[in-house]
Amino acid sequence: MKLYLVRHGKALSADQDLAQPLSVEGRDDITRLARTLGNMNVKVARILHSGKLRSEETARLVAAVLQPAGGVHKTGNLGPGDDISPVLELVRAEEENLMLVGHLPFLANLLQALVEAPDQDDLPLFDTGNLVAVEKIGSRWQVFRHLGPRMIM
């Protein structure tokens, strides 16, 4: 099973728009990431997002390319300050490839728990629009891919 963790793309500041939709740069970055994932033949059964507009827009841009059979869905457990425990349970029970689109510090905390890293300093960074992919091998999770807008030309 592969799990793709995606931090939402760059968004407008709350001063510009309280809903904080993706900025033009954020949309471009995520569109480029989605195309790269499509070119790599990445397959996910479904994409879950936090429900915040920037997260939903990111999820939908990626889904437009990857076409997950299970669609795109909001889940209440991917917010910036949410407890990772319910999502850890969900991920551990999942058998199909899954993508989660969320925020910091949630994604970094989830990644740290999955790979059992003692310190987040040893893990890939979650800049806006970045993806970190992990794969379950036996009973352990390992990072196998890290992509972001600055890494994709």
Regions found by a protein language model. Name each.
Residues 61-62, 113-114, 137:
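Residue-level signal for well-ordered alpha-helical positions
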Residues 118-144, 149-153:
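Domain-level recognition of soluble alpha/beta enzyme cores
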Residues 3, 96-102:
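Generic beta-sheet signal
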Residues 104-114:
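Extended, charge-rich low-complexity interaction segments
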Residues 2-85, 93, 107-108, 118-122, ...:
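Active-site-proximal alpha-helix that buttresses catalytic centers in soluble enzyme cores
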Residues 90:
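Active-site nucleotide-sugar/metal-binding loop of Leloir-type enzymes
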